[in-house]
Amino acid sequence: MIIEVRAKNCYAFEDDITFSMKADMRNKKFGANVHKENNFNVLKTVGIYGPNNAGKTCLIKCIRAIRNVLLNKKNGLMPNIFTDSDVCELGVTFMASGRKFSYDFKYDAEKEEYIYESFSEIFKYKYNNEKEVCWLKKDTVSEIYECIDESVQTMISVVSKNNLLCYVVDTSKFEHINEMKQILVGFAEKIDIINMNNIPMQHTIELMKNKNQLQQKVVGFIKNADLYMDNFEYVDMDRIQLKTGEGVEKPDEKVLDIPENIMDQIRLVSTYKGVHVPSMMFDSTGTKKIAAIASYVIEALEQGRILVVDELDSSIHFKLTRAIVAMFNNELNTSAQMIFTVHDINLMDCKRMFRKEQIWFVHKDEDGVYVYSLADFTAQQGVRDTTDVMEKYRKGALGALPDPELINSLLSIKGGVKGDDANAK
């Protein structure tokens, strides 16, 4: 599970930002929303709010970059366009098998080199104090090289910088570096990242092809979403009923269209009053998105995965988004985690759904981009457990709110008045 993400000079983030999923155990409210293991307390869900183009998606890009780096894939990292530095800095603290680890790296995007990386294990002891034990530190700028495997330490300075250390040495020969690689790769492989505006149906299709318990749970999820649907199946073509002239058409939504697998899409059918119809052609965009996300949600809950969702509320009714989040917050969920961006303030509910530290904001102004939690606001600032957070956010008291002036556009279109002239009047 992710405990903390750190970034500097990455995408929209020029200065240091820290996104934390550490639970504040002074707050006893909604204890089921917290995963507790070996005296570590981690939030099961976090929702991120903010205006368009503020940096919410950039935060998800940082998580994706961390995952891709750890899996030896193209990282896609870009330094902030307003800085002179080419060095992107990223870090993550996470739990794996009941242990807490921290990993940080610096990547020179111009030279395509990893100029710094460090890996540590964090132990908790008396009075909740923590102790960090360094397994690896490679700082090519300051020429500091440390490794728990002494035989590795002598070679760190001469190995290539075009990749992480665990991918440029034969880790099978070194006990701790090999374990480090397994921990990092195992963590990264558990992260699924999806965008609800461009979510692939193929993941659900592949699960629907296999008649097993996981497939049955995906179908149950879709049916329980209250879509007036009798069943949802992957069937043979002869069971699909099409009216004359309809033929095999592509779905309207390009975001859900997979041309090379169009027949797979057609065989994914919904049943209404005993009639089988191709879901991709007949169902609403929202229904298709629910079907697409169903496989990710079920797999996350079944296998203890980390599901990161951009624009969770896209084309989905607010009651369904609440229900999906509630599945992860439930006490029956013992290992899965969900991080999501959202605009729907109906989810901003600290009275019935969330702890304060589960609601985060991304705010942008002329000076930069800021990432902060609702828990950063004190009672003296007017935010208490009994506060109507939705109303506070509507009024702009929490920041991270757009301030559109579209009336100027209307006046310029309909009245022949330019925006600046309209303001002057």
Where are these regions (language model features)?
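Conserved P-loop NTP-binding catalytic core
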Residues: N39-G47, P51, I60-E112
